[in-house]
Structure formats: structure tokens, C-alpha cells
Amino acid sequence: MFNVCPGCGEYTDAKEITSSLPVRAVCPACKYEHRFLSLPLFVVTGASGSGKTTAALNLVEMAQDFVILDQDILWNDGFNAPENDYRIFRNTWLRMVKNIHQAGKPVVLFGSATPQQYESCIERRYLSHIHYLALVCESSELERRLVERPHWRNSGSAENLQKMLDFNKWLCENASRTEPKMTLLDTTK
């Protein structure tokens, strides 16, 4: 809905967003301007088993002024495109968040991701800021959690364990190097 220009009817995800208040979205085709809420997004990332679901469920009890979402609710095989760093999936989420923001509520989005995956999306321009919190834990604890999960989740397979341990390590080593930086939260205990 917000990608269609009320002035000329053109569809674009590349509207210019003004920096002055009130924020306006400007159609590149006809220069029509409309008011636009540009709110922050809070991304909670981490390897499987790092505590994202537990944190989300605990946060739900306090969620009156923000919306909590899990990125997995939109996942399907059509988004499985590692060759482009899952760009369509990430951009779809930013479009969803942009639309939710128009109701005046910021979003807390849970799911495994890196700042680069969101910051490089065209829909990123519509968000005032993205804050990244990375949940991490000690490798032995992460492995224990994944192995103890129900078998149907296939979390304890050797391949999955290695992928999650590697991602957890990457987050720990790179949180201060990403742009923007990620805040680390150790969930070991």
C-alpha cells in the first residue's frame, strides 16, 4: 500500500524519505509527497539455540507499545537464496515492518541475520534506525541446547551444529566490526 503513489499511481520501493520533520515520502516519478512514520526496528539475532524464542516469549508479556515478530513466520523455500544473501527475504521483512510502523508502533524482529543483510536492502531507507542485539552463548552450552531439542527440529545434526557454532563465533568476533555495530548479550546462564 505505501509503495503506490497516491499522486500518480506508480509503484516504487525507492521513494525519497525527507530528513525534516514531519518525515515525508516523495514519489520519484511525480514528486508527490505524503506523511510517513519512520520508526526504528530492533533486530534480535543469534544462532539457533541462543535464546531468541525464550526472549521473544518473555518480551510478549511487556509488548503494549511495540510489535514482536519472528522472521520464520514468512519463511518458505522461495526465499532460500544464499547466493544473494537472502536479499528478497530481508527486503520483504523490511517492507512488512515499514507498513506496521505506519500504525505508530516500532517492531522487534527475532531471527538469525546480520546487519549487512538488512542495511543493503532498498526498503531500509524507510526505517529511522535499526538496532541490533546479538544473543550469544558459550559453544558448549549452545551445543547442549541444540542436541537436547526435539528430534523433529534436526537441530542436533552434525551439519547444523557446526553451522550454528560457526555463526555464534562469528557474532562474538564481529559484533563490534559490523555497521552498525551489534550489542552482544551472553545467554549462557
What residue spans do the PLM features occupy?
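Conserved substrate/cofactor phosphate-moiety recognition/catalytic segment
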Residues: 56-98
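Short cysteine-rich clusters marking metal-coordination/redox-active sites
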Residues: 5-8, 27-30
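Cys/His-rich microdomains that often coordinate metals
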Residues: 9-12, 34
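Conserved phosphate-donor/acceptor-positioning beta-strand/loop module used by diverse small-molecule
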Residues: 111, 125-148
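Small-molecule kinase domains that catalyze NTP-dependent phosphoryl transfer to phosphate-bearing small molecules
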Residues: 152-189
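Conserved glycine(s) of the Walker
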Residues: 51
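Short linker/helix segments within small regulatory modules
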Residues: 15-25
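Hydrophobic anchor at the beta1->P-loop junction of P-loop NTPases
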Residues: 44
